[in-house]
Amino acid sequence: LSSAASDVYKRQYVNNNFIIMCTKDGTIKKTKLEAYSRPRQNGVNAIVIREGDQLIEAKLTSGNAEVMIAAREGKAIRFNESTVRPIGRVGAGVRGISIEESDEVIGMICVEPDSTQDVLVLSENGYGKRTDLDEYRITNRGGKGVKTINVTEKTGKLISIQAVTDDNDLMIINRSGLTIRTAVSQIRLAGRATQGVRIINLRDGDAIASVMAVPAAGDEEEVQSAEATGAGDATPDAGQPAEE
């Protein structure tokens, strides 16, 4: 691209895209990307956070995405991004999902209309599942959502929601420092309200700290089984999750 054409493309990109943010109490805010095009050395205000709340996700969108917000007690809501009116940087946003006072939002995904991504959720005790996006009906923003995993004492609370395809691996980091990598293609599709399967085996006293979907490992990178990882190992994992 010529310099002039490149400048036009950059302006169009900035003018036509948005940042969507979500907080722990279920507030969602949408702002034009253009609002952040003149950063300051010490940063700029992006959202007003109410006392006791905190920002947990920020996603770049086209303005036409479908938004899913998931909560710790196992419910998730899906709605069109178009129902969220863009506002300026200085603002608190609107209600994305209604949750009980004892509950909290654990994550948000934004899926574009032509995407082939599925929804993957993971609980704090290592249970997870992959579900077709269409099993989550589109509803009005601000509702209570529908069950996305059957939370039990065995599964523990919901800890992560990710948008994935077979071309992804799931990276799981435990509080002990152990990093586990499992191929998403090994996780079969399951119904929306099911318990799922055991994705990883946690050692006593350990817990999941962070989860991320990453590009799948190539042939040159081996993805090992969690069960083959001995105590004290600091890396790998994956392979076929064990069904419960």
Spans of features found by a protein language model:
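Single conserved hydrophobic/aromatic residue that forms the stacking wall/gate
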Residues: 1-5, 9
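A structural feature that tracks compact, well-ordered secondary-structure segments
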Residues: 18-36, 47, 58-61, 66-84, ...
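Generic long, charged, amphipathic alpha-helical segments
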Residues: 140-164
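Canonical WD40 repeat/beta-propeller blade segments in eukaryotic WD-repeat proteins
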Residues: 105-106
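Acidic/polar low-complexity surface segments
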Residues: 42-46, 92-97, 142-151
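Acidic, low-complexity intrinsically disordered tails
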Residues: 212-244
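Per-blade loop-tip surfaces of WD-repeat and WD-like beta-propellers in eukaryotic adaptors/scaffolds
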Residues: 37-41
